[in-house]
From Swiss-Prot:
Keywords: 4Fe-4S, Cell membrane, Electron transport, Iron, Iron-sulfur, Membrane, Metal-binding, Repeat, Transmembrane, Transmembrane helix, Transport
Pfam families: Fer4_10 (PF13237), Fer4_5 (PF12801)
Domain of life: Archaea
Mode of membrane association: Multi-pass membrane protein
The keyword Plastid appears for this protein: no
Record-listed [4Fe-4S] cluster 1 binding positions: C194, C197, C200, C229
Protein's recorded name: Uncharacterized protein MJ0749
TM segment ranges: 32-52, 69-89, 121-141, 146-166
Length: 246
């Protein structure tokens, strides 16, 4: 008997489609609720600069402290769940790229040149360091005008390239990705079931080369890849490794 522990594993395509559809609906509901909550908490002044400042540097608001603790604990257990299910800005960037997909009827998500992408994903760590250094040196990080201009810019970039801000700029994502590297539950590929169609990669908003190596630090646990895999080759599990081709 297979003693490995699986949380999500599919052998029946019909069952898989049904379950993944429900998971995607649940994710949309979660994103929407957390977005509405963020609007209420901030008095409808949703600032991308303020969000970064509060999350990275911190404040004394209990709700922020609890959210940060939950996000970090979740990252250590299951990866960047906060990014894919709870982040209010992730919700907005998700909306704009899905809007482009529907408007232009895209079957494959737009991608950044691979060489550029592989370098740009480290830029968010530079932003994280700069935010911390700015705080330590007493530089004030504020200004709603700047915040909304940046949000508008990243919404446009997110319309062109899915989750641009989340991939390359967000210091919150870079902080959580450090914990996600050691997450207990991981997205895994069974190479014996994979037929190399790369449907999963075409649907991945983070441009992860799933069939080559799943980067757990970049994965936001949106499970779009699992939703389109017709062979059930992907699983989200603990205490197992990728299954190599026999």
């Amino acid at each position: 008997m297979d003693s490995r522990v699986y949380i999500i594993k599919f052998d029946n395509w019909g069952f898989m489609v049904n379950l993944m559809n429900k998971i995607q609906i649940l994710r949309k509901i979660s994103q929407t609720l957390f977005f509405v909550r963020a609007l209420i908490v901030t008095g409808f002044y949703l600032s991308i600069v303020g969000f970064i400042k509060r999350f990275i540097i911190g404040d004394r608001i209990l709700a922020t402290i609890i959210t940060k603790i939950i996000a970090i604990v979740l990252a250590f257990i299951a990866g960047r769940v906060f990014c894919g299910w709870m982040c209010p800005f992730g919700f907005l960037f998700n909306l704009v790229y899905e809007l482009r997909v529907k408007l232009f009827k895209l079957k494959k998500l737009p991608t950044v040149d691979e060489k550029i992408h592989n370098k740009l994903i480290y830029f968010k760590y530079v932003v994280l360091i700069l935010v911390v250094l700015a705080y330590l040196s007493g530089v004030k990080i504020s200004g709603y005008t700047l915040a909304y201009l940046l949000l508008a810019l990243f919404l446009v970039l997110g319309f062109i390239y899915p989750m641009f801000f989340c991939r390359y700029v967000c210091p919150v994502g870079s902080l959580l990705s450090i914990f996600a590297r050691f997450s207990i539950f991981k997205l895994k590929l069974d190479e014996n079931k994979c037929v190399g169609c790369r449907l999963c990669e075409r649907k991945c908003p983070m441009q992860i080369k799933i069939t080559e190596k799943i980067d757990q630090m970049e994965c936001i646990r949106c499970f779009e890849c699992m939703s389109v895999c017709k062979k059930g080759a992907l699983s989200f599990s603990a205490f197992t490794k990728n299954t190599k081709k026999e």
